[in-house]
Amino acid sequence: NLIITMPNNIYAAIEQLGLTAQKRAIHIQFSNTSLNEQVFLQRIDGTHELNAGIELQLLCLSTSAHIPLKQFIGSQVAVDIVTDKSELNRISGIITKADVGASDGALTIYRLTVEDPTALWKHRRNSRVFMAKSVVDVVQTIFAEWQQRSPLFASSLTLDKSGLSKEYDVRPFIMQANELDSEFIQRLLSSEGINWLIDESQLKVSSSSEPIQPQKLRLIDDNAQYQSLERQNIRFHRSSAVESSDSITNFVGQRSIQPTSVHIQHWQANTLEIEEGAGSVQSKHSHSDNQDNASLGLEQAWHFSPAWIQDLKGEDGTTKSGNGQIEKFNQNLGHYYDLQAKQFMATSTVRDAQ
């Protein structure tokens, strides 16, 4: 009978079984270096979304059933995926949850949840007031506070405002009321139509042993900031190990009925009257061949909180409120509903997509 003893180093154990770990399509690296020789990545599942960040589930194996789960929590991790062009595409994050699973006496399963550093914002709630600041100023202030108070946050995320192309109103008063930092920041950015994206400082690496770099929180208000893949064209084709390139395997178009007009109003103290958007702004998007937008009559009528006011002498440096703020909300909501009405969803095997 052949008896194989499992060494403490998981990679040595894999080599003993006749498998070469270094030639695999996925590699993992921990900032807690003691884990690198104990944990072997078997499978990765996850999502990466605009305005939602990164969340990954890593299924790992180890020859040790007694790794303290606290060794995983708060550790930075990088997963390198070999693409169809033999390049290493990196995705990283922070381990926020760790589970230990079944063991057959030789190998033990560990499941790790990896999120981008903004996940830490979900664990701080606050109430505070910001005076004479724009939305971008407030986000920058909170970001700087996190960098000062949390070494983990400071070492894992930087703020990138190069994707902002517009000037934003300086508001006299912004309040965070019993809100999580994540909810507060998302609310402010949404009010100005600013998207955020978690990006890698170094998306492609030359070696899986390269140090883990901080990710970037990119603030974006212009679609020109999004870059297409270098390959430009992707085939619609079956997925197979014998194919030379990755492909799109499924493509679905979807339409759904959405509001056809938006109308917003709020109280304007400067003029002592209700200030409205430009009437009921009807969508230019054609929702149906059977009914036009006017006959559908699906209006979203919103009443917002009163417009802000400057100090009596107008010396506080804030932006004067006016119809422009209402028009911006009208436009943003209208564009949102138009995008929801018509969507395309693709499933692919493209490993360097982001």
Indicate residue ranges for each PLM-predicted region.
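Amphipathic alpha-helical and helix-coil boundary elements used as assembly
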Residues: 2-354
